[in-house]
A protein has these predicted regions:
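Short, contiguous alpha-helical
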Residues: 2-7, 18-22, 26-29, 37-81, ...
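Active-site rim elements
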Residues: 10-18, 88-95
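Short, solvent-exposed, charged loop/turn and helix-capping segments
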Residues: 35-38, 110
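Acidic/histidine-rich alpha-helical segments that form the ligand environment
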Residues: 85-122, 129-142
Length: 170
């Protein structure tokens, strides 16, 4: 009985992580779709990140932690370049790359067996379980999508359209 509960909890965790990743992707896309090309690389000051930087960073993180760290794909991440970029990708390219990284990550998560979530991996120099890596990746995605939305709201002001509506609103 306990083993079945553990398997069900692990299955639920894996499914929920993939669902949350897709929700965060939808929210990022809803924000970015409202922006023009110049907005993607806007920085309020030299020490801040643009939406383009944040998208590149999310792509690099998903590729390193999930596709590389868990899926054993080659880790080709250049983290410094994610933050140094000031152009080089169009809005549509960034959206496509982010969509691909999230969907490939969700596909990999969907193929994980529940007994693997306690397996240990060395990712970015950290010894972590697969469960820990997944929780880190989805929380990291949510953190930076929130930043993307915040920048979008600053740039668009009253013309920004929320991607969600509170219960009871029309």
């Amino acid at each position: 009985m306990k083993e079945n509960q553990d398997i069900n909890a692990a299955s639920l965790l894996l499914a929920e992580i993939a669902t949350r990743m897709r929700v965060w992707l939808d929210r990022a896309e809803a924000c970015i779709d409202q922006l023009d090309e110049a907005h993607m690389w806007y920085r309020p000051n030299p020490s801040s990140n643009s939406i383009g930087n944040l998208v590149l960073h999310l792509i690099g993180n998903l590729r390193q932690w999930i596709l590389g760290g868990i899926g054993n794909q080659p880790d080709t991440r250049d983290r410094a370049a994610e933050f140094a970029a000031t152009a080089g990708h169009s809005k549509s390219q960034l959206l496509s790359l982010l969509h691909d990284a999230v969907e490939q990550s969700c596909d990999l998560i969907g193929k994980l067996t529940t007994n693997r979530i306690t397996e240990r991996k060395l990712i970015q120099g950290e010894d972590v379980t697969i469960a820990s890596a997944l929780v880190m990746a989805v929380s990291h995605l949510g953190l930076h999508v929130g930043q993307i939305q915040y920048i979008g709201k600053i740039l668009l002001s009253d013309s920004y359209k929320e991607s969600w509506k509170p219960k009871g609103s029309k």
